[in-house]
Amino acid sequence: RVFRTTKKTFLKYITMDNNFDLVVIGGGPGGYVCAIRAAQLGLKAACVESRGALGGTCLNVGCIPSKSLLNLSENFHKAQKDFNQQGIEIEGIKLNIEKMMSNKNKSIQVLTKGVEFLFKKNKVTYFKGKGVLFSKNDIVVYESNNKRTNIKAKNIVIATGSDVASLPGVNIDEKNIVSSTGALSFDKVPKKLAIIGGGY
């Protein structure tokens, strides 16, 4: 529907506060760093992120949660196997996956809130919603509450990052066939697991 809006109508809803030198669409490691650096160099900068939390795939469903779970799993393995060989005997070791996931989520929240703090510190305006290009200088941000915000930018950087993609003929249901995102939110440890892909 935004593409049927006239230029005159669009400009009517733009205030001086929504005029920027640079708007970055995407709040991942590329996007938020770009917005912060632009602000540090004296530009009036904004960032649009649809996920609801800054940090992109890396902080939310990639590197950070992976490292958190790998670290906790390694500690469990050491307590089970390595400690006993070194003379440290521990009985009744159990894995509480619910607590592990809670720990992982707390780590994510600390880091994403840290990026929000950097935005405030460097005076980067943060728009939570989906950014849609109306023209080479005009953006509409659709928020989850159906609110619409119009933004004007002299320059626009698109840093939308990655998303989960299915393989041909393979339906990801997040139950039997899970994406990398789903694999970070298991409620129990699978007895058997085949992994397609060797990335982090």
In which residue ranges do the predicted regions lie?
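Small side chains
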Residues: A45-A46, A194
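Short, Lys/Arg-enriched N-terminal segments with co-localized hydrophobic residues
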Residues: V2-T15
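Glycine-rich flavin
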Residues: D17-F20, R37-L43, E49-V189
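The conserved SAM/SAH-binding core of class I Rossmann-like methyltransferase domains
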Residues: I25, V48-E49
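N-terminal Rossmann-fold NAD(P) dinucleotide-binding loop
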Residues: G31
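Beta1/beta-strand and adjacent pyrophosphate-binding region of the FAD-binding site
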Residues: D17-G28, K191-G199
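Aromatic/hydrophobic pocket-lining residues that form π-stacking "cages" and hydrophobic walls in ligand
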Residues: C34
